[in-house]
């Protein structure tokens, strides 16, 4: 991605957690896929899964040797956002900080635009 602005930030904390999970799974082909689906209390919700494939049109962002993959439909809702990993009172989880969301539910897993 030379001379191209990356439309989504993949934090060091998220990359470190993905790297540790890949080591646990013993599968170096795994990538973290973030996606948007309809649902949740605000209309859309974030999803995370491990995937071995990168489909045509997917955006791949690499940090510390691990890859984050986003499909084109989901990317349009995530531009300018950040995929992070947090540990706190609510437990540990991957989170999306999305500047495009006009409302977000209390748990942060669903949003509306």
UniProtKB/Swiss-Prot annotation:
The keyword Nucleotide-binding does not apply. Disulfide bonds: none annotated. PROSITE patterns: HESB (PS01152). Gene3D superfamilies: HesB-like domain (2.60.300.12). GO terms for cellular component: cytosol. Coiled coil: none annotated. Its cofactor is iron-sulfur cluster. Iron-sulfur cluster binds at residues 41, 105, 107. GO terms for biological process: iron-sulfur cluster assembly. One of its GO terms (molecular function) is iron ion binding. Keywords: Iron, Iron-sulfur, Metal-binding. Binds 1 iron-sulfur cluster per subunit. Required for insertion of 4Fe-4S clusters for at least IspG. Belongs to the HesB/IscA family. Homodimer. NCBIfam families: iron-sulfur cluster assembly accessory protein, PRK13623.1. This is Iron-sulfur cluster insertion protein ErpA. It comes from Mannheimia succiniciproducens (strain KCTC 0769BP / MBEL55E).
